[in-house]
Amino acid sequence: MFSNVGWGEVLVLLIVALFLIGPERLPGLIKEVRAMLLAVRNAISQAKEQIDGELGEDFREFSKPLQELNSVRQMGAKGFITKTLLDGDDSFLTSFNETKQDVKDTVDTVRKPNLRESLKADKTKKSAQPQPSLASGSADNGGIAVTQQSNAGESRSSHDSPVADAAEQLTGDVGSASEPKEKPSAPGYGWEDVT
């Protein structure tokens, strides 16, 4: 009730009371106020004891479900499932935790954590050596060599890609149409389809 009243405010109240009431009656008034506050405190404690005596058992029975609800609220989803479905036996969930950890370990080994840093490191290592064939664009235009991409786990080699195989076949066919693979020495070669 008086928790936010400071000592300065109490001093101001005493000075005002001293002027209003007078110095002769102030000590008697302080004793009366003190006795009144003690009487109120005793009345409140007696009322609490009487209510606890009459309604104590009923109140405790009523508060048990509320306490269970609070405990369920605090335990979280895993604890709630364990308590309700598995009767508190969480040994069933440990196999899921092991499987989850195995999957996480597998994913971590497959995934490279710092792909860009590994590409930059590979690029600086390879810059001293001759550049391999580029997959798309040149190194100046931001292209990344196929070997660098495959080292980073980003791309496959050109022999595994059906698109690259088809492109190679098309470019190979165009080259064979313009120039024969071998030049025959026999006269009349190449005139078979003209008749």
Curated annotation (Swiss-Prot):
Q: Which domain of life is it from?
A: Bacteria
Question: InterPro entries recorded for this chain?
Answer: TatB
Chain intervals for the UniProt region annotation (Disordered):
103-195
Q: Where is the composition biased (Basic and acidic residues)?
A: 103-125
Q: How does it sit in the membrane?
A: Single-pass membrane protein
GO BP annotations of the record are:
protein transport by the Tat complex
User: What are the record's GO terms for cellular component?
Assistant: TAT protein transport complex
Regions of biased composition (Polar residues) lie at 127-139, 146-155
Q: Which residues cross the membrane?
A: 2-22
Gene3D superfamilies named among the record's database cross-references: 1.20.5.3310
Q: Where in the cell is it found?
A: Cell membrane
Query: A Gene Ontology MF term for this entry?
Result: protein transmembrane transporter activity
Keyword Protein transport set for record: yes
* Family according to the record: Belongs to the TatB family.
Q: How does it assemble?
A: The Tat system comprises two distinct complexes: a TatABC complex, containing multiple copies of TatA, TatB and TatC subunits, and a separate TatA complex, containing only TatA subunits. Substrates initially bind to the TatABC complex, which probably triggers association of the separate TatA complex to form the active translocon.
Question: What's the stated role of this polypeptide?
Answer: Part of the twin-arginine translocation (Tat) system that transports large folded proteins containing a characteristic twin-arginine motif in their signal peptide across membranes. Together with TatC, TatB is part of a receptor directly interacting with Tat signal peptides. TatB may form an oligomeric binding site that transiently accommodates folded Tat precursor proteins before their translocation.
Q: What is this protein called?
A: Sec-independent protein translocase protein TatB
The record lists the organism as Corynebacterium jeikeium (strain K411)
Per the UniProt record, the lineage of the source organism begins with: Bacteria, Bacillati, Actinomycetota, Actinomycetes, Mycobacteriales
Gene it is expressed from: tatB
